[in-house]
Amino acid sequence: MEFLRLPQAMSRRGVNLLLALAPLATLARGSAALADSAPLTHAIAMHGQPALPPGFTHLPYADPKTPKGGRLVMGIQGTFDSLNPLVVLGVAPDAVPKYVQQSLLYRSADEPFTAYGLLASGVALDADRKELAFEIDERARFSDGRPVTAEDVIFTFEMLKAKGKPFHRSSLGRVTKVSAPSPRRVEFELGDGSNRELPLVIGAMPIFAKHATNAETFGETSFKPALGSGPYAVADVRPGESLLLKRRKDFWAEDHPLTRGLYNADEIRYDFYRDSNALFEAFKAGLYDVRIEGDPTRWMTGYDVPAVHDGRIRQETLHFDTPKGMTGLVFNTRRPIFADVRTREALGLLFDFEWVNRNLFHGVYRRAGSFFSDSDLSALGVPSDAREKGLLAAFPGAVREDILAGTWKPSETDGSGRDREQARRALELLMAAGYRLREGVLRNAKDEPFAFEITVTSRPQERLALNYAQSLSRLGIAVSVRLIDDVQYWRRLSAFDFDMIQWTWPASASPGNEQIGRWGSANAARNGALNYAGVKSPAVDAVLQALLGAREREDFVAAVRALDRLLISGFYVVPLYYLPDTWIALARGVVLAGRQPAYFLSNELLARLPAATPAN
């Protein structure tokens, strides 16, 4: 149940008036949500207990002695027309929520999913996860010196629920009541507690200052930065070109356990480049400092340059204990041409991973098949257990028998680029779906040719798509490849205006609400949502709820594996590949201070050693 139920005919002005008045109403309601039996603590975890005890001095991967100073320059492909990435409109970097604003809780990169109190000095959560409360740190201040209050938290909550991206709208919409019994305490009632990740989602909201934020225009694109409580402030914006952040000298949490050894640069600048080639050339020229490399050809051959030989650039390989997500060519199943699962499976058989990996990518990729590869969450090679079968019992046939048994695996070719057996199997599936090959053209029952477009946004994507299109042409399928800029690309994705795209869904050690955004039926028709494949499956919806409601680790693993099997059975993507490690290149003098976290790369660790010369 939503906190505000608005009449369908209510004007936009009326909505905004209610947004403005809602925090005042909840302040007046008093405290009735959380029982006194739920004590304040320093952290909450999705499963198990937090690793760090109360009173810890700093994160275990951070080094409080790291020197501070200098400038870090980050390079980004594309452009931007806004500073607010929390709404559907516009293309915006994540710099403001990440460095200018703060959240009630801060996620540790050393644990699967544990969040420690940041703006909140304490958090209370009952055992059933139906009631949640935060006590705001009395020291917490926005950059204008005004304190962070419960009113700011409620204002942020209502604004994101009403005007944020679909993820926040759907997640926060599950809250049944919010109240502020005091200026420093805010309480949430979370319905039946079935979404056990919801407390962590609420804790991760970037908090806006009510007195400095216009709720009426929040959903629009804007270059006006949010007033934040974080370690940096926006110093300069050059629309579409660059964004400069400078350290705040009056940052309230300079000596907080969650910031010691982090946020080490005095300045952080984001520079934007039109395409991937320009971005790479700029890095080799020393124009920015940190590059995550995802192109094997570049990693293997592109760094054979003087800057690497003389030490101005160094390459590092990092390994994290995080499942590897899915990179695939995504079918937009809203298109009639991709509505039949047999068609989708057939097209998957025609991707020659063995040839592509050897000839285009130096053999460094592993074949993707699961959405949670290299982890115990993956269903590949693992037969379903009683827990999984119980979750899937109400949906007979939703998972194929070979996938249920753990014997299915992505197709393997002979690596020739012309595997006749794979082509034969694919044609059989296409014929079963109603297609016939006539005079070299694959046609449906209406004699319409099988043709579609792959939309790409980079040259490496284009190269792969053209290779795949050539493979499909051998079965009479006409595929065009269109390369467009980032702004057009994101607009088309937001409206699901594409046939096929290449996409990567990152995985975490604790998948949760983001999976609803990716696969939930309600998000299949919601513009701006991440359900690009258009998945509409009662079985998927049911398993997603089981995943979010799991109390024990065994039940959680079973739910994730059941989800994996359902997605594999749906053949919503042509599985491509993944890298087992993370490749990073750093300019001389730029380091990941402290030690590498266990689960993901934390940019907050980056530091420039005092003797190093910054990028221009």
Residues of each region from the PLM?
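Extracellular/periplasmic solute-recognition and catalytic clefts
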Residues: 177-179, 235-246, 271-335, 342-346, ...
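Ligand-site clamp/hinge motif
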Residues: 137, 220, 253-304, 345, ...
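Surface-exposed binding/hinge segments that line
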Residues: 135, 169-214, 231-238, 383-395
